[in-house]
From Swiss-Prot:
Protein name: RNA polymerase-associated protein RapA
Keywords: Activator, ATP-binding, DNA-binding, Helicase, Hydrolase, Nucleotide-binding, Transcription, Transcription regulation
Group of enzyme by EC: hydrolase
Binding site for ATP: 176-183
């Protein structure tokens, strides 16, 4: 290698040193100074791992004074290069000696890196190309955002999420019955809206008691990091911004908090949101004369926020007027007059009845034919297919079908049976004494609800007098009974739920110390991580806990459907909480009958409450949509009965009669009022099943797993296989980056298997939508990882020393999330021979890749230097070929975009003629989007992303 003082070289092994300058050439040694870091390196001249830095005509280079120039000519004098050209800031002619080049020059273009000897491993070049292909496919995928959640593939949930999540600024009422997964549907919609870029800022308003449940669900299921805002958080955030709600993109807030703090509500209103989600929307009371403060607040937000999701399990149970009020929040122009709404509903009721006859497949009555003919032009009912088509058209024109989704258990398959087992037990003397003493000491005070609650939990009364360490578990017959149940069902997983964390902790200790039963506790005093560990211990089949003991609040939002035995150690006073408890096991996908075990102490209010739930509402063995209104109607009488704690049968019998008289007609009315047309629309039918099949096929695709493992290997992430489909990832000591996106410093347990993730809250479900996968791909493509490579091709059919140049171009336009459906960054691969012919279409990447042998960076640099002029020429020819191919890609994307959006527009315009629920803003949005995307597709640019230089050898 001819070295000369002042020449600029770059280290092949320590590229972060920047540009080096030759400062000494003595005998067989050469010394380089790297001014950027102030370090010296001495090398043997013959084997120095360095590459000469030389630029070419057309390159832009920077001087040590930070001005840049465009090279027009390269001269050489005494072994030193002089770059002649013009400055980019003032167009003055200039000559720059290489010794005055900027020491911090970075080689960002792949060709510059190749010629500067910054050559990467061949495996990283492969990883980069695969990352481009995978990114391209994912961004075009219509199910993007659906597959990534830790959720079961349940047809109706996926259908609703897909249908709503793809809309611009969706405004809908999600009104599935309890247990059908409204929170999951909302989470999937939010996830899609965020990933697609349709939304960036999301506000969720909830009752205070549900805040943590939503926080955990959004994080655990969808990897969405919401922030919980209360007064303390607002004060804290005030240091960073005048409006605290502008410091986070994803916010959860209590509606009650905003109602009490007017200034905070004004700040929420001033912050700009893309999507508003309101849970328990049936609590928003409205009348034309006097709407509630909570309703007015949501109304004010709904007027400003483009997208609104309202969640309620009771769309019409609380009366038609409140149902109208919620629809009015979504579209006040459409639902402007209550009387007009009632008239329309009545007319629609006739259509729904006619549709019911159509669905039942019976001979249509004359009235039904008349109604259907008035709704559908050219009505054809000749065969089953024609009837199905008629139903499909009715669905599209459906009264509130675009804004309201409602599924009931009656129209959704896959729920298990529920079976109640009750165990009456004598009231221990210790409890009798404690209750008597409390009465003598005047401890029966408090409001009606407080007194009703007191006698449901006699262990708390006992502790009141004996202290917190009182060992009630030694004499309470429910504890002995629970021990026997667990010992008799050693192979069964048992979930125990009680109202208080202290009860769960005491029970776990009693089970462990008396019989060595393996258990775990799960309560609100534990951190999310501690709860995850307890949940994972319970889920473990080998060596896991047999029993999980949960408090009321601790169990919110968790599903344990791998267990089928539920022990209700005590009963909640609220029927919604009872259903929530049973819902931990009673889920779609539960394989067995859910065995519900209820022990109670005779002669106490525990027995009265158990009978009220079972004989009055049938709430143990069936979901009870009437429970809430019936509970509100008999609340005072129920509380009086429980507070009396006498065990008298007469008042209990009277209450049971009254409860049934309210429950049965209301249940019949709800069943009769079921909107079959709406349910068919909401469940998705065949379209929903197609979605499930598509996502299941994606789950079975091993391509994502092999790419993920390859990515972790190349970046330097440690992987430890723990069995049971689990892999522990931890940051490696020699990673290419200081931290891997989404990977905590203490590591993370992941699985690629959906079923494993559903039963193990301590594991992350890795999918293409997971932040680690998206972040990993962005990390690779946003850096120079794998941008250059050199390889040998052993092929005796080709002349030795022949060269090939593999060029990876990317065609891309401005980053617009809506554009990705049609024109995501698109890789164009060329394989150029020495004559400038493209062999890329004839020689597939994978097959070619398997024939190549990697070379080390030093040898690779020498091979590149020897062929530099040829490589330059091939890059120029490749650019011209890629431009031509880009034209075809752009034309195809433009045509697909125009066709897709025009179809959407035509359908909505036709629908608007018969269904007023299509908003003008949706039509305007599509028209504007069409024009904007047309312009962006025309602006598509080409960039060279990666180069691989290949030399043919016969050895």
């Amino acid at each position: 290698m001819p070295f000369a003082l002042g020449q600029r070289w770059i280290s092949d092994t320590e590229t972060d040193l920047g540009l080096g300058t030759v400062v000494a050439v003595e005998g067989r040694m050469v010394t380089l100074l790297f001014p950027a870091t102030g370090e010296n390196r001495m090398y043997a001249k013959e084997e120095a791992p360095v590459t000469r830095v030389s630029f070419n005509v057309g390159d832009q280079i920077a001087s040590h004074e930070d001005w840049t120039m465009t090279v027009e000519e390269v001269q050489e004098k005494d072994g030193l290069l002089i770059y002649v050209g013009v400055r980019t800031d003032n167009d003055e002619p200039v000559a720059l000696k290489e010794v005055f080049l900027n020491n911090f020059i970075k080689f960002n273009k792949p060709q510059d890196r190749l010629f500067a000897g910054q050559i990467d491993r061949m495996s990283r070049f492969t990883l980069r190309y695969e990352a481009l292909i995978n990114q391209h496919q994912r961004r075009r995928n219509p199910t993007r955002g659906l597959a990534g959640g830790r959720v079961s593939l349940i047809p109706h949930q996926l259908y609703i999420a897909h249908e709503v999540g793809h809309r611009y600024a969706p405004r809908v009422l999600l009104a599935d019955e309890v247990g059908l997964g409204k929170t999951i549907e909302a989470g999937m919609i939010i996830h899609q809206q965020l990933l697609s870029g349709r939304a960036h800022r999301v506000l969720i308003l909830l009752p205070e008691t549900l805040q943590h449940q939503w926080l955990v669900e959004m994080l655990r299921r969808f990897n969405l990091h919401f922030s919980l805002f209360d007064e303390e958080r607002c004060i804290e955030a005030f240091a960073d911004a005048e409006n605290p709600f502008e410091t986070e993109q994803l916010v959860i807030c209590s509606l009650d908090f905003l109602r009490k703090k007017r200034r905070r509500f004004e700040q929420v209103l001033e912050a700009e949101w893309d999507l508003l989600v309101v849970d328990e929307a049936h609590h928003l009371e409205w009348s034309e004369e006097a709407p509630s403060r909570a309703y007015e607040m949501v109304e004010a937000l709904a007027e400003q926020v483009p997208g609104v999701l309202l969640l309620t399990a009771t769309p019409d149970q609380l009366g038609h007027q409140s149902h109208f009020a919620r629809l009015r929040l979504l579209d006040p122009e459409r639902f402007y007059d209550y009387d007009a709404f009632l008239a329309e509903e009545q007319a629609y009721g006739q259509v729904a009845s006619a549709a019911q006859e159509l669905l039942d497949g019976e001979t249509l009555s004359d009235e039904a034919k008349r109604i259907l003919a008035s709704q559908l032009e050219g009505l054809d009912l000749s065969d089953a297919a024609a009837r199905q088509q008629a139903v499909a058209k009715l669905l599209d024109q459906h009264g509130t079908g675009r804004v309201l989704f409602r599924n009931s258990r009656a129209n959704i398959q896959g729920f298990p049976e529920r079976h109640l087992n009750v165990y009456p037990m004598p009231l221990p003397e210790q409890y009798k004494t404690a209750i008597k003493v409390m009465g003598m000491m005047g401890g029966n005070g408090g409001d009606l609800q407080t007194r009703a609650l007191r006698y449901l939990y006699p262990e708390k009364i006992f502790q009141q007098f004996e202290g917190d360490n009182a060992t009630w578990t030694q004499f309470d017959p429910r504890v002995e009974w629970l021990l026997e149940l667990l010992l008799s069902a050693r192979q069964q997983k048992v979930l125990v739920i009680c109202s208080e964390a202290a009860t769960a902790i005491a029970l776990e200790e009693a089970l462990r110390t008396r019989e060595g039963i393996r258990g775990a506790v799960f309560h609100e005093g534990m951190s999310i991580l501690e709860r995850d560990k307890a949940s994972a211990y319970f889920a473990q089949q080998e060596g896991g806990a047999q029993v999980l003991l949960c408090s009321e609040i601790g169990s919110e939002g968790r599903n344990f459907q791998f267990a089928s035995h539920l022990v209700l150690f005590d009963l909640p006073l609220n029927p919604d909480l009872l259903e929530q408890r049973i819902g931990r096991l009673d889920r779609i996908g539960q394989q067995n009958t859910v065995e519900i075990h209820v022990p109670y102490l005779e002669g106490t209010s525990q027995r009265a409450l158990q009978l009220w739930y079972h004989d009055g509402l049938d709430a143990f063995e069936q979901t009870c949509p009437t429970a809430r209104p019936v509970f509100e109607a008999v609340r005072d009488e129920l509380f009086e009965l429980l507070a009396a704690n006498t065990g008298d049968q007469a008042p209990l019998d009277a209450l049971l009669v009254k409860t049934r008289e309210l429950h049965e007609p209301l249940k019949a009315r709800l069943e009769q009022g079921r909107d079959r047309l709406l349910e068919i629309h909401s469940s998705g039918g065949a379209a929903a099943q197609q979605l499930v099949d598509k996502l299941a096929a994606e789950d079975d695709d091993t391509g994502m797993i092999s790419f993920a493992l390859k990515m972790f290997d190349e970046i330097g992430v440690n992987q430890d296989d723990r069995g049971e489909n689990a892999l522990v990832l931890t940051p490696g000591d020699h990673m290419l980056v200081s931290s891997f996106p989404g990977l905590p410093q203490d590591g993370m347990t992941i699985t690629f298997d959906r079923n494993t993730a559903l039963s193990r809250d301590d594991m992350a479900l890795l999918s293409w939508d997971h932040p680690m996968m998206r972040g990993g791909i962005d990390l690779i493509l946003g850096s120079e990882i794998g941008a250059t490579s050199v390889a040998l091709l052993k092929n005796k059919a080709l002349p030795i020393g022949s060269i090939l140049l593999e060029l990876i171009f990317v065609a891309e336009s401005a980053a617009h999330p809506q554009l990705y459906r049609f024109m995501p960054p698109t890789p164009i691969r060329l394989l150029m021979d020495k004559n400038g012919q493209n062999l890329g279409e004839k020689v597939a990447f994978d097959a070619f890749n398997r024939q190549l042998t990697p070379v080390n960076r030093h040898l690779g640099s020498k091979l590149v230097t020897a062929s530099q002029p040829v490589i330059h020429g091939l890059i120029g020819k490749g650019q011209a070929i890629a431009e031509e191919l880009k034209g075809g890609i752009v034309d195809k994307a433009r045509a697909q975009m125009a066709q897709t959006l025009q179809q959407d527009l035509d359908r909505l315009e036709a629908l608007k003629a018969v269904n007023p629920n299509v908003r003008d803003s949706e039509l305007d949005y599509l028209r504007n989007l069409q024009a904007e995307l047309h312009h962006l597709i025309d602006q598509t640019q080409l960039k060279l992303d990666a180069i691989r230089f290949i030399v043919v050898t016969h050895n």
